[in-house]
From Swiss-Prot:
The chain crosses the membrane at residues 76-96, 134-154, 170-190, 201-221, 325-345, 372-392, 407-427, 475-495, 503-523, 534-554, 576-596. This is Membrane-bound O-acyltransferase GUP2. One of its GO terms (cellular component) is endoplasmic reticulum. It is a multi-pass membrane protein. The active site is at H496. Belongs to the membrane-bound acyltransferase family. The gene is GUP2. It comes from Saccharomyces cerevisiae (strain ATCC 204508 / S288c).
Length: 609
């Protein structure tokens, strides 16, 4: 294999196209590219004329700039990367070294590791649970995949019916007797949606109100004994509690599926109602069932070239009878995506249960499995050598340099990113092997973000898509940006955790987002000026600092810890030199981020993040 071929494989491995089959050049880009190529051939009388998308006038103002990778400017940036990045890693290692005066403060949180006799930072309770149960989870994954393939092949039962039975067993195994609480919520959602279906606004209000109410009631009553509900239920307190006693911990993801089913059902019901208003619709009447069969099913259950794209699958016209209780339970308890997602809408799940997407090839799945393994290995290496999680929990950074304290914050954000990315990718891989292609949740590395808007789009992408479909668009979308932004981030904050700190995080994010949008609009008129990219780089560097502070406050250190960390960074004799170096380094990093996105545009990819 030639070096060029190897380099091409490496570039593809780290590209966004390798993450998700949904990411591909849009049709309009391909059409414009063909027009430009044909026009160039006509002008030059030869197909060998130089044609590059980067100079394509057909793409007008949206066309990417000429490549900068081989310019002297970027060669200086490469040199800076080879110096700065190792220096950052060295500083992070120094904070975790046994020779560090603060080591004794956090050493008690370290466990015995498996890499070269090193200890491992296993202090994060969420990732510790995942790490401790990884091999059990691997056995469950293999068991579910094998059983489903055997049952579906030999019994010819629909996949959704197997998912229904498997989901019930899986939830009971995970939650034990506490699964009764989850299914009680599910039954109430199903009842509200179907009993109030003729009054869509009332139904939507009732469903959303109850959905938000469940977040609060679960917080208050998560450990409520059955004995407190009724004396006759007291024996249930001694029954099997499952391997996840905190059943409420993962309920938030189930809530998204409960809301998705309810909203999709109401939307489909009223679409049918508006098309044939003369019929008294009752889903229990045989003539109603008959009237809704036929061409609709043939249209949406067509594979091959006519397979529906993601946006079409979200509003696929399923038979109204497909919104039944069995499919409802199969969807909300679908084992591969049950615990933490990624989130897939009910309409999309139902469509993919009947139609295997062409993207689910052995090559794509194998390539994605390699990415999952690489992420796991990277996380293990970091946890064995950089103990910033334990340091943050004990606030053990006294007398560390400003750079070392900044690395504690940065690597904490990276660990938070990886601890979310790994389960999401593992469960998505499980779903892909099972025949369901859920959205990729992490389109960008946490260190490859300079925009609040872009960060929100690329971080937890499936949740972002869910929010756009069920909150952002119904509230008016971009026509009412301030209201929709506060509605979205208030829900996001409450959904994450019912704490005032997280709610403040949501509101701070909104303010940063609105400020970024305003400044971007003010400067967009100058986008063709030679200095525009450099001014944007300065603004993006400042924006990165703000995003780091907000997210460290919201999800890592809280108010007191963030205050202490910032005090240590800024209240130091070397702070001015350090902050100058930080801004220069971030500016260089941002220029590379800009060029990565421009390179994607040259291939017709514009993720807007």
């Amino acid at each position: 294999m030639s070096m060029l071929r190897i380099w091409s494989c490496i570039v593809h491995f780290f590209s966004v196209q390798a993450l998700d089959s949904r990411i591909k050049p849009d049709i309009e880009f391909k059409r414009r590219q063909r027009i430009f190529i044909n026009s160039s051939k006509e002008e030059n009388g030869s197909s060998s004329s130089a044609v590059t998308v980067t100079r394509n006038p057909v793409l007008s103002s949206n066309s990417p700039s000429p490549p900068l990778w081989n310019t002297w400017e970027f060669r200086l940036y490469y040199l800076a990367f080879t110096v700065v990045v190792p220096f950052m890693i060295k500083a992070a290692l120094a904070t975790s070294s046994e020779s560090n005066p603060n080591y004794y403060k956090f050493s008690g949180l370290l466990a015995h590791g498996w890499i070269l006799g090193r200890k491992v930072d296993n202090s994060d309770p969420q990732y510790r649970f995942f790490r401790s149960n990884f091999f059990l989870l691997a056995i469950l994954i293999l068991l579910q995949i094998i059983l489903k393939k055997v049952f579906v092949k030999f019994s010819k039962i629909p996949k959704t019916k197997f998912d229904f039975a498997c989901g019930l067993v899986f939830v009971c195994f995970m939650y034990g007797i506490n699964s009764v609480k989850l299914f009680t919520h599910a039954f109430i959602f199903f009842t509200l949606a179907h009993s109030l279906k003729r009054k869509r606004l009332i139904a939507a209000f009732a469903i959303w109100s109850y959905g938000i109410f469940t977040l609060f009631i679960n917080q208050k009553m998560k450990n409520l004994p059955f004995n407190n509900i009724a004396i006759i239920l007291s024996p249930m307190d001694q029954w099997y509690k499952g391997i996840v006693p905190r059943w409420d911990f993962f309920f938030n993801f189930t809530l998204l599926r409960l809301l998705s089913y309810s909203m999709d059902f109401l939307e489909r019901w009223h679409e049918q109602l508006s098309r044939q208003p003369s019929i008294d619709y009752d889903d229990r009447r045989p003539e109603f069932r008959k009237s809704l069969s036929g061409s609709t099913l043939q249209t949406i259950y067509e594979s091959g070239k006519n397979v529906l794209e993601e946006k079409e699958r979200l509003v696929a016209e399923h038979h109204i009878q497909d919104y039944n209780f069995i499919n409802f339970i199969a969807y909300i308890t679908y084992a591969p995506l049950f615990l933490v997602g990624p989130i897939i809408t009910f309409n999309d799940y139902l469509y993919q249960s009947e139609n295997k997407l062409p993207s689910l090839t052995k090559k794509n799945i194998g390539f994605y499995a390699l990415k999952v393994f690489s992420s796991l290995l990277l996380m293990e290496i970091i946890l064995h050598y950089i103990y910033v999680g334990a340091i943050a929990r004990t606030k053990a950074w006294n007398n560390d340099t400003p750079l070392q304290q900044a690395m504690i914050a940065l690597f904490n954000l990276n660990i938070m990113y990886l601890k979310l990315l790994i389960p999401w990718r593992l469960f998505r891989l499980w779903a892909m092997v099972d025949g369901i292609d859920a959205p990729e949740n992490m389109l960008r590395c946490v260190d490859n973000n300079y925009s609040t808007v872009g960060f929100w789009r690329a971080w937890h992408t499936s949740f972002n898509k869910w929010v756009i479909r069920y909150i952002y668009v119904p509230f008016g979308g971009s026509n009412n940006k301030i209201l929709t932004s506060f509605a979205v981030f208030s829900f996001v904050a409450i959904w994450h955790d019912i704490q005032l700190r997280v709610l403040f995080w949501g509101w701070l994010t909104v303010l940063l987002l609105l400020g970024e949008t305003y400044i971007t609009n003010c400067f967009s008129r100058y986008r063709f000026r030679s200095w525009y990219r450099f001014v944007c780089g300065i603004g993006a560097a400042i924006n990165i600092c703000m995003m780091m502070i907000i997210n460290v406050y919201g999800f890592c250190l809280g108010a007191e810890g963030t205050k202490l960390l910032l005090k240590g960074i800024f209240n130091n004799s070397h702070s001015p030199e350090f902050l100058t170096a930080v801004m220069v380094s971030l500016f260089i990093a941002v220029q590379v981020m800009f060029e990565i996105r421009e390179e994607e545009k040259r291939h017709g990819i514009n993720l807007k993040c």
